[in-house]
């Protein structure tokens, strides 16, 4: 792994004030520094102020799990990119498979959210990936190509440089299933090559992380693959020791 490693924890809809305080404090204590790697936690909206309070001035960044594609307006229940920056966020996840599947977010909407994030100087963590049915139909590359092309078509390839791409095989999310390191590497290489068709320098530099049931006991093997630069971590990010171990595995 020649690029700097990156690990982001996605807490999803878990946590409370007491648990968060303990978890964040443990992560800060466990990660005083990283060599050629960085890490972040993406927390539920109500806990952004808490994350900011605990993490400010540490080696751990923080961010959100979703944003509206709109900057402001009569959009009840929505949260804008600018609101996240008010809480010091550096990152935001866009296009997570759960957003696409449960809330009907299509490629165009995800592209608009990506653009909205960058307009407010947030780094989007763009999720791409295929379902089990799509994989079994040998449609993995076509699906991911459409997801990437929607973003590049809207913002241009230069904007991709200021982002992180997360490959999440939907069939491996929360199931305990994990793509083999080689299966994950093959898709990561495809993503990098797809970007390289537009700009090889950007493709060489961009961080592409893996988001399919990464745990402390498989992180090192996954991150050793040449095109896997870290992970987007779900359940394991809620356990301090697991998350810390994964972050250290991303060092190079």
Curated annotation (Swiss-Prot):
EC number of this enzyme: 5.3.1.1
Xref: Pfam families: TIM
Record bears the keyword Isomerase: yes
Any single GO CC term annotated in Swiss-Prot or TrEMBL for this entry: cytosol
Residues reported in the UniProt entry to bind substrate: 10-12, 174, 213, 234-235
A Gene Ontology molecular function term of the record: triose-phosphate isomerase activity
UniProt entry tagged with the keyword Chaperone: no
Compartments, as annotated in UniProt: Cytoplasm
CDD domains: TIM (cd00311)
Gene name of the encoded protein: tpiA
Protein name: Triosephosphate isomerase
Pathway of action: Carbohydrate biosynthesis; gluconeogenesis; Carbohydrate degradation; glycolysis; D-glyceraldehyde 3-phosphate from glycerone phosphate: step 1/1
Function per UniProt: Involved in the gluconeogenesis. Catalyzes stereospecifically the conversion of dihydroxyacetone phosphate (DHAP) to D-glyceraldehyde-3-phosphate (G3P).
Reactions accelerated catalytically: D-glyceraldehyde 3-phosphate = dihydroxyacetone phosphate
Protein keywords: Cytoplasm, Gluconeogenesis, Glycolysis, Isomerase
Entry-linked InterPro entries: Aldolase_TIM, TIM_sf, TrioseP_Isoase_bac/euk, Triosephosphate_isomerase, Triosephosphate_isomerase_AS
Active site residues according to the UniProt entry: 96 (electrophile), 168 (proton acceptor)
Record's subunit section: Homodimer.
GO biological process: gluconeogenesis; glyceraldehyde-3-phosphate biosynthetic process; glycerol catabolic process; glycolytic process
Record family assignment: Belongs to the triosephosphate isomerase family.
């Amino acid at each position: 792994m020649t690029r700097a490693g990156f690990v982001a924890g996605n807490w999803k809809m878990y946590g409370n004030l007491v648990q968060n305080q303990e978890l964040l404090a443990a992560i800060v204590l466990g990660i005083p520094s990283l060599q050629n790697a960085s890490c972040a936690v993406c927390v539920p909206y109500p806990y952004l102020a808490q994350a900011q309070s605990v993490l400010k001035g540490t080696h751990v960044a923080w961010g959100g799990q979703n944003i509206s594609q709109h900057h402001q307006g009569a959009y009840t229940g929505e949260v804008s990119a600018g609101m996240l920056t008010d809480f010091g966020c550096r990152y935001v996840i866009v296009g997570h498979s759960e957003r696409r599947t449960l809330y009907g977010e299509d490629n165009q909407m995800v592209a608009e959210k990506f653009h909205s994030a960058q307009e407010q100087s947030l780094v989007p963590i763009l999720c791409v990936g295929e379902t089990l049915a799509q994989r079994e139909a040998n449609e993995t590359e076509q699906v991911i190509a459409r997801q990437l092309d929607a973003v590049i078509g809207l913002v241009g390839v230069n904007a991709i440089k200021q982002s992180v791409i997360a490959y999440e095989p939907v069939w491996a999310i929360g199931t305990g299933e994990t793509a083999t390191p080689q299966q994950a590497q093959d898709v990561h290489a495809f993503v990098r090559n797809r970007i390289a068709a537009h700009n090889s320098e950007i493709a060489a530099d961009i961080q592409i992380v893996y988001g399919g049931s990464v745990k402390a006991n498989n992180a090192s093997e996954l991150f050793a693959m040449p095109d896997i630069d870290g992970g987007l971590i779900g359940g394991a990010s809620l356990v301090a020791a697991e998350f810390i171990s994964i972050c250290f595995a991303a060092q190079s």
